UniProtKB/Swiss-Prot annotation:
Pathway assignment: Carbohydrate degradation; 2-deoxy-D-ribose 1-phosphate degradation; D-glyceraldehyde 3-phosphate and acetaldehyde from 2-deoxy-alpha-D-ribose 1-phosphate: step 2/2
GO CC, any one term: cytoplasm
Protein name per the record: Deoxyribose-phosphate aldolase
SUPFAM superfamilies from the UniProt entry: Aldolase
Secretion signal span: none
Molecular function terms from GO: deoxyribose-phosphate aldolase activity
């Protein structure tokens, strides 16, 4: 309980609305919740950007679009187009899934060229999603180094569509990046205790669709004294 007093979770939360069946009503709710709780960002599909931008225009909430999500297996050209279109629609941040197949093939140049043009062309905050639950220890390190070289601003653990964030993976990314970029933990974050453990390991953002639940849990702990 004491640790729950040390962190206000709201400024860490990227409030996600990434169910494939997400409706306009759900996007409106997501944006309203982000405003009410002062979350740092909402995270949506590109098709929901216009609505999110309209609802959050002039507000202190970042608008993040996912790119190549969730597989990362789109062509590099299509990812670049998707990213540029998202930027034109008003996204302020991009969560881009790397190509895991290229990484596992050892084609490091292609992995770099899948990400770097997006960073350069859009000028937005780019978070590279490594999907660490699918990688070996050496692949995790390699993926992180490639993305750092590509100029991303964040390393992100997972899409949330597989194995979610672990303290060990966040700690590894923090060790590799040495403070050069932010770390976003995402996937399976359901409790305040999990959230705090990830922050203590080095996470600077938490990607979750359960942001409101986490805030409610934390408020209950505060009220219990």
């Amino acid at each position: 309980m004491e640790k729950s007093r040390q962190f206000d979770l709201a400024p860490y939360i990227d409030h996600a609305a990434l169910d494939p069946a997400t409706t306009r009503e759900a996007i409106a709710t997501c944006c309203a919740q982000a405003l009410h709780h002062k979350f740092v960002a909402v995270c949506v599909y590109p098709s929901a950007l216009s609505q999110a931008v309209e609802l959050l225009r002039g507000k202190k909430v970042e608008i993040c679009a996912v790119i190549g999500f969730p597989s990362g297996a789109s062509t590099s050209g299509s990812k670049l187009y998707e990213a540029q279109e998202a930027a034109e629609l008003g996204a302020t941040e991009l969560d881009v899934v790397i190509n895991l197949g290229l990484l596992k093939d050892g084609n490091t140049e292609a992995v770099y060229n899948d990400i770097a043009p997006i960073v350069e062309a859009t000028g937005l905050t780019v978070k590279a999603i490594l999907e660490m639950g699918r990688l070996t220890e050496s692949e995790k390190r390699l993926a992180a180094e490639i993305c750092l070289d590509a100029g991303v601003q964040y390393l992100k653990t997972s899409t949330g569509w597989g194995k979610g964030a672990t303290v060990a993976d966040v700690r590894l990314l923090h060790q590799i990046s040495q403070g050069r970029v932010g770390i976003k933990a995402s996937g399976g974050i359901r409790t305040v205790e999990q959230a705090i453990a990830l922050i203590e390991a080095g996470a600077t953002r938490l990607g979750t669709s359960r942001g409101v639940e986490l805030i409610q849990q934390q408020q209950q702990l505060w009220e219990q004294g």
